Amino acid sequence: MTPVASTSALNLARSLYEAGIRNEAVLQAVANTPREQFLDAALGHKAYENTALPIGQGQTISQPYIVAKMTEIILQTKPTKVLEIGTGSGYQAAILARLVPQLFTVERIKSLQIQARQRLKRLDLHNIAFKYGDGWEGWPSKGPYDAIMVTAAASSIPDALVSQLADGGILVIPVGEIAQQLLKVTRSGDKYRSEVVEDVRFVPLINGELA
């Protein structure tokens, strides 16, 4: 099914361009993804504001600019196989699934995972594999990955995740507790290079599972 962009989604994409997002495929994915479908009806009127919003269980749907920025970084390697840590509402997965052939996504909160699966199915996005589990551990049996995106802030870079990167692959992850930075970690053989992208604010990446 070919998505039809709403005026609100198109306006959001334009505002992201003005904010510095330049990848046309990312902007098109934002324009074609109905963000209101990833929120409770009571928050639907705020869907196209450039702000993070609550989705329950102490979690949030990320600010659209950050979703687009992290996606833009991921696409630098032209990945075919991507791992997302923190499915959350499913919005970031919806953007990624329009842009990469294979997406694997892990969520530790069962109720959020169930809702996200239903939303993504309604959008006819079928190139996504879901796992209920601890994001700190990744999904090693499906790796290695060309890119890994983490949508919650880790206190440090998880060794388990960098070990699941393919050679030349990148990990995009917010790191820190009070002060957080978005990092791009690139694997080259047995070595890893870390670059700071910008200051950010995310909910914490928590160990374990929650039914």
Swiss-Prot record:
Family of this protein: Belongs to the methyltransferase superfamily. L-isoaspartyl/D-aspartyl protein methyltransferase family.
Listed GO biological process terms: methylation; protein modification process; protein repair
GO MF term set: protein-L-isoaspartate (D-aspartate) O-methyltransferase activity
Places the protein is found: Cytoplasm
Catalytic activity: [protein]-L-isoaspartate + S-adenosyl-L-methionine = [protein]-L-isoaspartate alpha-methyl ester + S-adenosyl-L-homocysteine
The protein's name: Protein-L-isoaspartate O-methyltransferase
Enzyme active site: S62
HAMAP family given in the database record: PIMT
Protein keywords: Cytoplasm, Methyltransferase, S-adenosyl-L-methionine, Transferase
Main location: cytoplasm
Alphabetical list of SUPFAM superfamilies matching this protein: S-adenosyl-L-methionine-dependent methyltransferases
Organism (species): Shewanella halifaxensis (strain HAW-EB4)
NCBIfam families cross-referenced by the UniProt entry: pimt, PRK00312.1
Matching Pfam families: PCMT
Domain of life: Bacteria
Taxonomic lineage of the native organism: Bacteria, Pseudomonadati, Pseudomonadota, Gammaproteobacteria, Alteromonadales
E.C. number(s) listed in UniProt: 2.1.1.77
Cellular component aspect of the GO annotation: cytoplasm
InterPro entries cross-referenced by the UniProt entry: PCMT, SAM-dependent_MTases_sf
Role this protein plays: Catalyzes the methyl esterification of L-isoaspartyl residues in peptides and proteins that result from spontaneous decomposition of normal L-aspartyl and L-asparaginyl residues. It plays a role in the repair and/or degradation of damaged proteins.
